[in-house]
Amino acid sequence: SYINVLREANQIAGTYSTDEALFSSPEAYKAHLNGQYIDWADELLQTGVTQNYSLSVSGGTEKTKAYFSLNFSDEQGQFTGDDYKVYSTNMRIDHEIKKWLSVGVNMQGSYVYRNKAYSRFINSLVSVPLGTVYNEDGSINVTPVPGDGNTINLLLNQDKSVYRDNNQNFKLFLNPYIEIRPFKGMTIQSRLNASLGYDKKNYFQGIGSYQYYASDGPNASGTSASVYAQIDQNRSYNYKWENIFTYNFNIKKVTSWNHNQTDKSWQKQDNIKNNSYLWHNMDGTGIVYSNYTMSKGLGLVGRINYSYLGKYLFSASVRQDGSSRLAK
């Protein structure tokens, strides 16, 4: 038990005198005598539940083939307030317009929304397990042991009006192609690999959060530097365009062009006076940061294979690449 651990530790250190002296305050000792103990791990943890749903359809004709799927995943984590949702889709269409002409496209998209709990599980192992978690009216005790400010209630951040940490992520991949077969043995394929990405993180710790009382004391009131909101945004756009010329699998030429760009922004503001706005009402007094990167590249590849008498294979290739990242 907790009291036995305290006794043993103090006896080993040679500092044990009385049970009451083991506690940080008379109020904490009183809570022990009244049997007011808290299992912090049990209060923070919950049974995790995962749900997965999927729907797919496929079909086609002699010249057309298609596939479509929808997927949804909902995960409730082991910490109260931790959840993770994923929506995704996949679509593919291939169509032969003429015997010498085919087109197609493959598209994949996903949207992820996650709420992250303030899951400092280590705190549940080292926090004093004394007192009561809730007041008689059902509200959360800031200090589980009244009058003893040495322990702050670990459940404060389960209130979404004082603490939020969520992420949103969107990704789209698009891969169209066209294939031309002008004469026997000759194939020309042009394909595009494009992707869009958007990631946003919203964070808020307000008046009444665990960090607020841990930083400013259990009797804190009003705003302070520990009350702040933060937004991180990342946008990316990339594509690669390839043209592949093949003749009898012996001669191949590839041209490749790629473009990559990323736009990042970050904003933070502290001393927020009203929890109601969360991160939605920042003014010009906060910290703002932005960054933009872009690069382009071009590649040329040629390859010739020649087989003689079915015994000897001769191969020659050449490649040349250029990138804006290498520019002086």
Each model region followed by its residue ranges:
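Solvent-exposed loop/turn segments connecting transmembrane beta-strands
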Residues: 78-81, 324-328
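Structured alpha-helical segments in the cores of large, soluble enzyme domains
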Residues: 53-59, 298-308
